[in-house]
Amino acid sequence: MTPSLALALVVTAAPLCAQTPATPGARPGGRTASVNTAPRIDAETMARPIDMHDSVWIEHLTMLEVRDLIKAGSTTALILTGGIEENGPYLTTGKHNNVLKATGESIARGLGKTLVAPVVTLEPGNPLRPNLSPGTVVLTQATFKAVLTDMSNSLKTQGFKDIVMIGDSGGNLTPMKEAAEALNMAWAGAGARVHFIPEYYNYADVEAFEERELGIHEKMEGLHDDYYISAIIATVDTDAIRMPERVKAGRFVINGVPLAPIERTIANGRRMVEFRTQVTVEAIKKSMAKQ
């Protein structure tokens, strides 16, 4: 059984009691269900009845908005991968996913004519490893690559020409590269291409930028946490770095660097998002120019 099929079976399987055929048009409690039996309007061909919503995130757009954006030239899509893992006592397990909320938005707008697919929130790993930390949820390498493959094919089928893969967690990079290479072989001559962009994963450069441009020097405490990570996350969600609780406990500091005042930390986070955006957009444009 292929990973894609196995995943589909897990997602769609229903309890036996739920699979018992019901009376057509009937709902529990005797109400008639007309929504699933009445003819459905072919919305794909209808004119969009409201103004376009301003978002780069596909899941925040209607189908007609996505359709019209593609027709207007937004044929680049970002596939972003994060993870759910141990990040110390202050950062939530979704650290990488929260970073991508900030960087994904910025990269899409900086590149232009670009939409963002739903974030792949789980990273590859061994789900049977006995010492998984509390809260960690991982996919096998095969399943992770199957998800990337299915997402890419879904985007290509509806008209996206350039699929850009970006990973915020180091363990994501190799399987992303492999998935991109396999897809490009399968799509040869089809007018679409996958771009794997390792330049995005540049935390060493971010740390150097932090020291050079912001004058911040961290003294590492041994936690899976850094000032630059906390600052970037703070631009989208201060609860994800546990600001209220840490302020109350007198622990609103990381690696010797105060996170208060929060306005300064957010401003620094925005500068680091801008830095990562510039590097990533340049790398994407360079990859696209090779076609």
Spans of features found by a protein language model:
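Bacterial N-terminal signal peptides
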Residues: P3-P15
